[in-house]
Amino acid sequence: MLISKRRMIHALSYEVILLVIIAIALSFIFDVPLEVTGTLGIVMAVTSVFWNMIFNHFFEKFERKHQLERTVKIRILHAIGFEGGLMLVTIPMVAYAMNMSLWQAIVLDFGLTMCILVYTFIFQWCYDTIEKRLGYTPRHS
């Protein structure tokens, strides 16, 4: 199996929980209907998945062509390129859906990114704890 059941559960639970948190938080903070923030979250998540596939395809071609080693510097450039490219697409979405200026959308997107970093850490820690209690031991290949 290309993707294990465990990985699918992990990815789906991560995305669904994040989507619910963001949709509710944005709706509450900006007094925007939950349908708007929920739809925005779904569209942004789908966009992120497609951008991930496209960006990584071309990044890996670039990597092979230039025989780059995956150093910390390359990973930082990869992360900046990925997030920067994603922001070029999602900031106008945020501005439109939330009825705000591009500058406000940039600030909001940056704030969301910082919150998602914290969420990711907490989610991973909780997920690891749950797996440990269930007796799962990760195998490293």
UniProtKB/Swiss-Prot annotation:
Which regions form coiled coils? none
Subcellular localization is given as: Cell inner membrane
Asked whether the keyword Repressor is assigned, the reply is no
Q: What is its main location?
A: membrane
Q: What induces it?
A: Induced by chlorhexidine.
Q: Name one GO molecular function term.
A: antiporter activity
Q: Which domain of life is it from?
A: Bacteria
Q: Which InterPro entries match?
A: BTP_bacteria (IPR007896)
Q: Name one GO cellular component term.
A: plasma membrane
Disrupted gene: resulting phenotype?
Deletion mutant shows increased chlorhexidine susceptibility.
**What keywords would UniProt list here?**
Antiport, Cell inner membrane, Cell membrane, Membrane, Stress response, Transmembrane, Transmembrane helix, Transport
| Tagged with keyword Nucleus | no
The residues that cross the membrane are: 16-36, 39-59, 76-96, 103-123
Q: How does it sit in the membrane?
A: Multi-pass membrane protein
General function of this protein: Mediates the efflux of short-chain diamines when energized by an electrochemical gradient. Involved in resistance to the synthetic biocide chlorhexidine, a widely used antiseptic and disinfectant in both hospital and community settings. Interacts directly with chlorhexidine and mediates its efflux via an energy-dependent mechanism.
Protein name per its UniProtKB record = Short-chain diamines transporter
Origin species, per record, is Acinetobacter baylyi (strain ATCC 33305 / BD413 / ADP1)
